[in-house]
Amino acid sequence: MQSANLSSAKSFRNIGLIGRPDKISVVETLCLIHDHLRGLGLHVIFDQETAELVPYTNVQTASRSLLGEVVDLVIVVGGDGSLLHAARALVRHHTPVIGINRGRLGFLTDIKPADALFKLDQVLKGHFQLDRRFLLEMEVRTKGETLYDAIALNDVVLHSGKSVHMIDFELQIDGQYVYRQHSDGLIVSTPTGSTAYALSGGGPILHPSMDAIALVPMHPHTLSSRPIVVGGQSEIKLTIRENRVLPMVSADGQHSVSLNVGDCVHIRKHPFKLNLLHPPGYDFYMACRTKLGWNQDFDLIKEQDDS
């Protein structure tokens, strides 16, 4: 993780705002940030969906896909899911993103609402840590023709949809046959996603700086099947075999598409990275302790001893 070195660090003049819909606390935080930024003389642009949430008129808006072209920084107010959704639209513009947590865990949206204005002021003055996160790109092909493609910041997941039946697929890495597996599916995760669904599936936690991809089987029929960590440049191919149900594949859990026998899912690193910003003092291991409850018992004992 690097200290502030973005060329735009001294020119955060145009600020984009994105908020999670249908949550009153998000609207309150958006209004607080909007008024603060305007008070600093900065130009604020809402994405079109977010503009419908706030009680302002005559605000400037831009579509989610174009917002990254017209702003120097995007502030996302919501949970990690909100930032995931925004990241996929913004990554091609290389626009820096920072998150205010109005969700649950907040691994990506790591600033508490109570600290938002103070932390944002630090970032606007050029005091921040730059955290470059890679994404995955996924293609579904049949007979060499691309049927569907998507990008993911967290993970690409092969799963059985609403069915309780296991699915049958073959895994190749860099053109080498690895195994054929009967399981509920496979999670292909970035380091960012290693603290999300992959963690729930028994996968390892990867430090965000690692150039690696984790492959986590979901309830495999073979007990010896374990998570595999491969290099970030690896080309992963999943081939669908005969199944009682139609498997599905999703990117960041946002949209699933059905797969047929013989379809292939190709997964590799996306050429662009997300420029995620953190305020000074950000510590990944502290985030793990806080979000995952590490040290809880020891901290409780220490509090009791100190009392």
UniProtKB/Swiss-Prot annotation:
Q: Does the keyword NAD apply?
A: yes
Q: Where in the cell is it found?
A: Cytoplasm
This protein's GO cellular component annotations are:
cytoplasm
Q: Which InterPro entries match?
A: ATP-NAD_kinase_N (IPR017438), ATP-NAD_kinase_PpnK-typ_C (IPR017437), NAD/diacylglycerol_kinase_sf (IPR016064), NADK (IPR002504)
BP terms from Gene Ontology: NAD metabolic process; NADP biosynthetic process
Top enzyme class: transferase
Q: Name one GO molecular function term.
A: metal ion binding
Q: What is its EC number?
A: 2.7.1.23
- Residues given in the record as NAD(+) binding sites: 80-81, 85, 154-155, 165, 182, 184, 195-200, 254
What is the reaction catalyzed?
A: NAD(+) + ATP = ADP + NADP(+) + H(+)
What cofactors are annotated for this protein?
a divalent metal cation
Q: Which residues form the active site?
A: D80 (proton acceptor)
Purpose? Involved in the regulation of the intracellular balance of NAD and NADP, and is a key enzyme in the biosynthesis of NADP. Catalyzes specifically the phosphorylation on 2'-hydroxyl of the adenosine moiety of NAD to yield NADP.
Cite the HAMAP family for this sequence. NAD_kinase
Family, according to the entry, reads as follows: Belongs to the NAD kinase family.
Its name, as the record gives it, is NAD kinase
Gene source species: Acinetobacter baylyi (strain ATCC 33305 / BD413 / ADP1)
